[in-house]
């Protein structure tokens, strides 16, 4: 059994219209939400063995803040395929993960991330900023992941929930 954690990046700023979309920073609320989520995941024992993030600044910063506050010690892998990604892009990223990893966190963007979750768990999903979906997959090899419904949604962790 594998566990997949799908995390939408935290609240990002649109204050500077000159910034490229990939370079948008987190708002103060986004930083706090990411810290809080990391602490909650640590306390619950839901810490990934691997984090893979989009290369966009807001996703990278979300991943690093969550990682720091859940005491994740490894390097965060960056994958440009997770920026403006389709559900199929997510499938390919996950399928490339080593089977040595049992719990993987993907940090990305909507609409692709929510669409991926919807297809995997056969639900209507719309992840808000800094929401994390925890899902179980009924196999032991990441390469077995297909785009069709096969996952069981365990929990959605909402950024606004308190410790």
Language-model segments: what does each one mean?
Residues 3, 7-80, 85, 89, ...:
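Active-site-proximal alpha-helix that buttresses catalytic centers in soluble enzyme cores
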Residues 16, 116, 145:
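Residues that scaffold the ATP/ADP-binding catalytic core of kinase and kinase-like folds
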Residues 44-46, 97-102:
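Glycine-rich phosphate-binding loop signature in dinucleotide/nucleotide-binding domains
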Residues 40, 65, 69, 96, ...:
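Active-site catalytic microenvironments for nucleophilic, acid-base chemistry
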Residues 90-94:
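Conserved ATP-dependent adenylate/AMP-binding module captured primarily in the ANL superfamily
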Residues 102-119:
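A glycine-rich beta-strand to alpha-helix segment
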Residues 123-154, 158:
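Domain-level recognition of soluble alpha/beta enzyme cores
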